[in-house]
Amino acid sequence: MSPRPEKRRVSIFGATGSIGQNTIDLIARAPEAYDVVALTGARNIAQLAADARRLSASIAVTAEEELLPDLRAALEGSGVEAAAGEAALLEAADRPADWIMSAIVGAAGLAPGFRALRHGTTLALANKESLVTAGPLLLAEAATHGATILPVDSEHSAVFQALVGEDIAAVERIIITASGGGLRDWPEDDLARATPADAGAHPNWDMGQRITIDSASMFNKAMELIETKEFFGVSPARIEAVVHPQSLIHALVGFTDGALMAHLGPPDMRHAIGYALNYPDRAHLPVDRLDLAQIARLEFHAPSDTRYPALKIAREVMQTGGQSGCIFNAAKEIALDGFLAGKIGFMDMSGIVSDTLDAMSSKNSLSNAPETLEDVLQTDQMARNIASARLAR
């Protein structure tokens, strides 16, 4: 193992979101260990500027070009460079860094992640859309340039840790856990009337609104099933999800000898982030320690396809492969926009996704794999247009 630089150069894409803020929390606790190169965000200029000042970042970038004057004003006198727009995000990804957090939500995180891999860096991947929409391309890009991708989702970090030193050929099954979300105790017949406020309250995790609603609908878990297939190269038949209300076991890996290895930890994203930040070493993290005697009980049950139709759609997407993951993600994002805007009900989101997949399958074969990032972005836009049209009906 080659020695690390005296200070690790780090960049955080999506710095103002939940993952970004937890990453900043860990970095700020050890300023002697890190040099912050770039922080990026969207509309929360005050937070972006405050963090850039506090961490003495080289550059702060907002994705919103019209907010550049605000960012410049907020950074005046700090010595931190300000920039805005898609080109600026890519330029920030080109800046030399040893470790980059990819936490921009949605398809917007694709291009910066791909650009960073060209420089052979370590990419901590919290942007699950990258693997769902362009998994084979992303992994090929990393291999071509000698880059490392580390998963930051708590479930995939747990699987990754359970597989250290193991032969992937000996893996019989991978089980990722789901809390069930904020509506898990609602009668199934009542789910159709759930509001964004109802679905946006999570019993265990402190996350942003969109991902919390995706947790309630299990679209988040559906994405993670697809992500598991892409990242670990395991066949869909060997990947499953189980509802685990306590959110203390994040994933389990079953082996051909019958052993089942579980990863336990508190529902705190700083654990998965900290593991990726310090990999291959482990560092002390400011997270709660589990008291097994106090926990006393761990529960599991199988999720229902009628309650969580997103899981059924995800299994079909895993079997189909090709561009279906990209379509699934794009339609899911449009459907969530529609739910947040009050245009459709909570249980209508899965219908938008299914309709979009069906509509695009009539245009071409969903199993045709995209060959370039441009192919992915084109498919993404087509799917968004179709899903938006369905939403407008």
UniProtKB/Swiss-Prot annotation:
GO molecular function annotation: 1-deoxy-D-xylulose-5-phosphate reductoisomerase activity; manganese ion binding; NADPH binding
Keywords from the named record: Isoprene biosynthesis, Manganese, Metal-binding, NADP, Oxidoreductase
S-S pairs: none
Binding site for 1-deoxy-D-xylulose 5-phosphate: K128, S154, E155, S179, H202, S215, N220, K221, E224
Signal peptide (UniProt feature, chain positions): none
Listed EC numbers: 1.1.1.267
Cofactor entry: Mg(2+); Mn(2+)
A GO BP entry: isopentenyl diphosphate biosynthetic process, methylerythritol 4-phosphate pathway involved in terpenoid biosynthetic process
Binding site for Mn(2+): D153, E155, E224
InterPro entries: DXP_reductoisomerase, DXP_reductoisomerase_C, DXP_reductoisomerase_N, DXPR_C, DXPR_C_sf, NAD(P)-bd_dom_sf
Biochemical pathway: Isoprenoid biosynthesis; isopentenyl diphosphate biosynthesis via DXP pathway; isopentenyl diphosphate from 1-deoxy-D-xylulose 5-phosphate: step 1/6
Amino acids binding NADPH: T16, G17, S18, I19, A42, R43, N44, N127, E129, G208
The reaction(s) this protein catalyses: 2-C-methyl-D-erythritol 4-phosphate + NADP(+) = 1-deoxy-D-xylulose 5-phosphate + NADPH + H(+)
Gene3D superfamilies according to UniProt: 1.10.1740.10, NAD(P)-binding Rossmann-like Domain
Cited NCBIfam families: Dxr (TIGR00243)
Known role: Catalyzes the NADPH-dependent rearrangement and reduction of 1-deoxy-D-xylulose-5-phosphate (DXP) to 2-C-methyl-D-erythritol 4-phosphate (MEP).
Similarity field: Belongs to the DXR family.
PANTHER family: 1-DEOXY-D-XYLULOSE 5-PHOSPHATE REDUCTOISOMERASE (PTHR30525), 1-DEOXY-D-XYLULOSE 5-PHOSPHATE REDUCTOISOMERASE, CHLOROPLASTIC (PTHR30525:SF0)
Name of the molecule in the record: 1-deoxy-D-xylulose 5-phosphate reductoisomerase
Encoding gene, per UniProt annotation: dxr
